[in-house]
Regions:
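Glycine-rich, Lys/Arg-enriched anion-binding loops that position phosphate/diphosphate groups
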Residues: 164-168
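N-terminal Rossmann-like or analogous alpha/beta NTP/dinucleotide-binding catalytic cores
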Residues: 14-156, 163
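Acidic, Ala/Val/Gly-enriched low-complexity intrinsically disordered segments
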Residues: 5, 11-14
Length: 168
């Protein structure tokens, strides 16, 4: 438990996450993420991203580029890097204001992987195996452990920011 408290301290005080506009400190936290694994289309915009733009005016928005989640299926490292930069530019272009919100890359905040690992050590494998996506894909030859532990990384993402709202 002490280690988890240390992780919260690290995230809240020593990373880019703490650089949000001081005016946002009293606002409730909204946390959401998007993978840099494909081209953004009108469905992404209308289904999620437009909502983020609106939410940043009322809440303290943490918009995560979920590159660690994206690598649960094989990806070319150069493609992920390129798509991550492209996605960051796109988020700003559609109206996510870096002066109102925090836009960050998941892998640049080590606490995500660290807390994810801690949660992995506390989570029964049977619980993870019940995940629908895992059940559907486990028979394929290319299924990796990252898919199995995806839910614990998602939980870590949310817990680190103590979000009150997590739009999906």
């Amino acid at each position: 438990h002490c280690y988890i408290a240390t992780l919260f301290s690290i995230v809240n005080n020593e990373t880019s996450v703490s650089k949000a506009n001081a005016n946002n400190t009293a606002k409730q936290i909204v946390f959401s993420g998007i993978q840099p694994s494909g081209n953004i289309h009108i469905g992404n915009y209308l289904g999620a991203l437009k909502q983020w733009v609106d939410l940043q005016n009322k809440y303290r928005l943490f918009a995560m580029i979920a590159d660690l989640h994206a690598i649960t299926v094989p990806q070319e490292p150069a493609a992920i890097r390129s798509k991550t930069i492209e996605l960051a530019r796109l988020l700003i272009a559609i109206g996510i204001d870096p002066n109102k919100s925090v836009i960050f890359v998941q892998s640049h905040v080590p606490a995500h992987a660290e807390l994810g690992w801690i949660l992995n050590t506390l989570t029964p494998v049977g619980e993870l195996e019940r995940m629908t996506q895992y059940k559907e894909k486990r028979e394929s030859a290319g299924t990796m452990a990252g898919l199995l532990t995806y839910p614990t990384l998602m939980a870590a993402d949310i817990l680190l920011y103590q979000a009150s709202t997590v739009p999906v």
